[in-house]
């Protein structure tokens, strides 16, 4: 599936239906009074967060969303039918932003969350509502109220418990493949990962979502490389795993480069707890590992784990440390526990 995390779309709610001009026509009644009904309400524009979507790719091909207008009013005081709401389904983690991207208008963080974004126009008045003691046969009516319209941006921020970051070629794809069900592309060159990847990790009876984002390079905040566009996908993470390539020229400098980009990006990423992992342990001896770990501690790391995504060495202590930052139940675990609670409360089936 192609990944797209930003899309610009046009929205327009439905206009209200016009009121009717009508008069009663009955046998033996020469002058029937007005009986034109009101118009129906226009359709609303509604956003709904649904499960099973993790990209905005559908909005590349469908960019204009217009709700239907309400039906005309009719004779015999019949109000026109209201138009159905136009429901736009988006992935959980989607934000709706103003056209200039300066204001967040809606933020969808839970499955089933619905927001009525643009209200449909109210139906116009029929001539029956204009009848008065001085105007027994009014012919005026109201057109329906116009719908609302605007351009908005959709921005997807994936919901993950743990974020995985580092310079290009730090071994992030190999690592996420080793610890989760992800099937990320692996290659011996920089920028193998071009879009974020999600994987579900099961460790010691716990389950959490790990997000791998494309590698950062110096100047990413100014647009170098792939840039910092994908950093938004780890804004909601509780803890970050910072992979540092032990076979690189200067692991301490690599560590500082990534942290400088986090600080330049802002949004609180520089303050998130980090678990620093020297990756590719299988390519170095113990003395070299110890020396690089000491340099990372001096560079600001709180604790350093030596791991190998290729062989699995050292990964278990790292995942143990991750569990210490997670809540009692993560988003994936909550769904399972809710089902179990319902089963326990229900007990044996009874028709009563």
Curated annotation (Swiss-Prot):
> What processes does the entry annotate via GO biological process terms?
ribosome biogenesis
Query: In which broad location class does this protein mainly occur, judging by the first location in its UniProt entry?
Result: cytoplasm
- Name the enzyme group at the top EC level: hydrolase
Residues that, per the record, bind Mg(2+): 173, 193
Q: Which residues form the Obg domain?
A: 1-159
Sorted keywords for this record are: Cytoplasm, GTP-binding, Hydrolase, Magnesium, Metal-binding, Nucleotide-binding
What InterPro entries does this protein map onto?
G_OBG, GTP-bd, GTP-bd_Obg/CgtA, GTP1-OBG_CS, GTP1_OBG_dom, GTP1_OBG_dom_sf, OBG_GTPase, P-loop_NTPase
> What are the boundaries of the region Disordered?
329-352
Residues in OBG-type G domain copies: 160-327
This protein's source sits in the domain of life called: Bacteria
Binding sites annotated in the UniProt record for GTP:
166-173, 191-195, 212-215, 279-282, 308-310
Q: Does the keyword Hydrolase apply?
A: yes
The subcellular location is: Cytoplasm
Q: Where is the composition biased (Acidic residues)?
A: 339-352
Q: Name one GO cellular component term.
A: cytoplasm
- Which metal ions or organic cofactors does this protein require, according to UniProt? Mg(2+)
Q: What is its EC number?
A: 3.6.5.-
Q: Which purpose does this protein serve, as stated in its record?
A: An essential GTPase which binds GTP, GDP and possibly (p)ppGpp with moderate affinity, with high nucleotide exchange rates and a fairly low GTP hydrolysis rate. Plays a role in control of the cell cycle, stress response, ribosome biogenesis and in those bacteria that undergo differentiation, in morphogenesis control.
Assembly mode: Monomer.
Instruction: Name the protein family.
Output: Belongs to the TRAFAC class OBG-HflX-like GTPase superfamily. OBG GTPase family.
Protein name, per record: GTPase Obg
